[in-house]
Structures are given as C-alpha cells and as structure tokens.
A protein has these predicted regions:
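Sec-dependent bacterial lipoprotein signal peptides
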Residues: 1-20
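Bacterial Sec-dependent N-terminal signal peptides
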Residues: 19-47, 265
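Beta-strand-rich domain onsets/edges
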Residues: 23-31, 158-168
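Short structural boundary motif marking the start of a folded domain
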Residues: 29-36, 67-69, 110, 168-170
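Short amphipathic, basic-aromatic surface patches that mediate peripheral association
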Residues: 35-62, 174-178
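Beta-strand elements of well-folded, non-transmembrane domains
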Residues: 41, 75, 165, 176-178, ...
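Tryptophan-paired
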Residues: 60-125, 181-267
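Extracellular beta-sheet/turn segments enriched in Thr/Pro/Gly and aliphatic residues
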Residues: 134-166, 175, 255-272
Length: 272
C-alpha cells in the first residue's frame, strides 16, 4: 500500500516539475544597459550678467550644447575596457541622448567616462581618462565631461549622466571711441592656466595659451577665448597686444598686463 501511494505521488509531481521548467525556459533575457546622457551646463553660470554672451534656451536639442561625444565603459574592478566609441556627431533633436550598449555586457559594476565637444581624439589620453585642455598652447575646444559608477543588474539597467563644461571663457570688449589707425586684430598671451583635466574633474599641470583674433573695419570688436581654469585667484596673467594683421610681431598698442581669474563654466569679461 505504501509503495502504491509513493508511486501515485511521483506521478502527480512529475507534470508539475515539467510545467515549472517550461516557464523558466521562456523567461526573456534581461534588457541591455542603456545610458541616457543629458547636459547640465547649458549656459555659463553668470551668463545673465554678461551682455556680450547670449543665453541659450533650456530646451534645445542636445547637439546645440554638445555637438560630439566619445565614451568609454570600464569594469570597476579590473579597469578593463568593456565598450568604447570613437568620436561621433550627435544628430537628431532629442534633449537627452540615449545610448544602447552591447547586450553582451554582463551584469556588474562599471565606470562610464564621457567627453563631449571635441572634433577628434587628439587631445584625449590613450586610456580615455584625461584630456589636454590647451593642446599646443592653443585655446582648444569647449569640452564637456561626465564620469559615473554604474550598477547593472536585473533591476538596474537604465542610467542617466549629465555633462558638465570643463572650461571658462574670456571675453574682451573694445570700448574706446577710436583705436590707433591700422589696428585690425589682437594677440593674447595668457600665462598660468591648468593644462589637463581627468575624469574625476581634477585639474593638473600649468600652461600658457596664445590666441589671435582679427576683425573687419567698423566691426563691433568683441573677442572670445575658451580657457581652462586659473590655478588660483588672480593667478593668470593676460598680456594683450593690438596689432595689424600684416605685421603681427610689431604691436601698435599694448595695454598694461592684468591679473585675471578663469573659472570652470564662468565668463570673465574685460573692457578696453
């Protein structure tokens, strides 16, 4: 009798086990990791106090603030690169840019680094974790960056990061009624700004920047130069020459050197 009961129980359990196995086999794969990239610094912090710089709308397409992107995803524990893009142009009118990563990426913890605004990878280090802000002593480009640690598992597969500007902008306005005859340009030598920034927003190194601007007669004279931050308050020296383009090495007017402070995502304005 006991043997008969055991046999009946076994027969009753078998279909249940088979049915449970079928349900398990039909579970869909977990969705791939998706990154949503937004822009935090859509305007300079003090843009409303500077007439020479126009405020951008807060609801423009992503590409109106940051035209290009490059990203690298690393395993948090090993540092190995899991996925990396080249520099690509941002297209479309989305305000937040979705990036679908490879479905082959396993669950885990990762570090995502995103750079924006560059035309190529020349200024970015080989490991993608730092950037030369003023390559070859030039002003370089208006670069954005974000970096974040990401948990990817069955419950966390959609993550948003925000791009922040790495540099500030120097604006020089000509307020004199008339400049000496023949002046149609300016040459700036800026001494004492940071040279590099890494993915932790740590600035290092020191460099000088040279910038030349030319203008047409009767043109409203405003020059704008994108610069990395100063090492300290009033720690950057500006030497300015007003020149004629035909002989830029012989300045026609040289104001007194001034100390300035450049800050990330801020406008510094001088008037002559």
């Amino acid at each position: 009798m006991k043997g008969t009961i055991r046999n009946i129980a076994y027969i009753l359990l078998l279909p249940a086990m088979t049915f449970t196995s079928c349900i398990r086999d039909e579970i869909e794969d977990c969705p791939p990791l998706q990154i949503n990239i937004a822009v935090k610094d859509k305007n300079y912090f003090n843009v409303d106090n500077v007439e020479a710089e126009q405020r951008k709308g807060d609801n423009l397409a992503f590409r109106e603030y940051v035209p290009t992107l490059y990203y690298v995803l690393r395993d948090l524990n090993t540092g190995d690169v899991v996925e990396e893009s080249g520099v690509f142009e941002v297209k479309g009118d989305k305000q937040i840019l979705p990036v679908d990563l490879c479905p082959c990426i396993p669950h885990g913890r990762y570090v995502l680094t995103v750079w924006g605004g560059m035309s190529n990878l020349d200024a970015i280090s080989e490991d993608g974790l730092s950037l030369d802000l003023n390559p070859n002593s030039t002003e370089g480009e208006d670069i954005y960056m974000t970096n974040d640690t990401i948990l990817y598992d069955a419950w966390h597969n959609n993550h948003t990061v925000e791009m922040e500007r790495t540099k500030g902008k120097l604006i020089i306005e000509k307020k004199w009624e008339c400049l000496p005859e023949g002046i149609n340009g300016s040459r700036k030598e800026i001494n004492g700004v940071y040279d590099n920034v890494n993915n932790a927003f740590k600035y290092t190194g020191i460099t000088d920047v040279l910038a030349t601007h030319l203008w047409e007669p009767e043109q409203n004279i405003i020059t704008k130069t994108v610069l990395s931050p100063s090492l300290k308050e009033n720690g950057t020296k500006l030497h300015l020459d007003f020149i004629n383009a035909s002989d830029p090495s012989s300045p026609l007017l040289t104001p007194k050197d001034v100390k300035i402070t450049m800050k990330r995502n801020e406008l510094t304005v001088l008037r002559y």
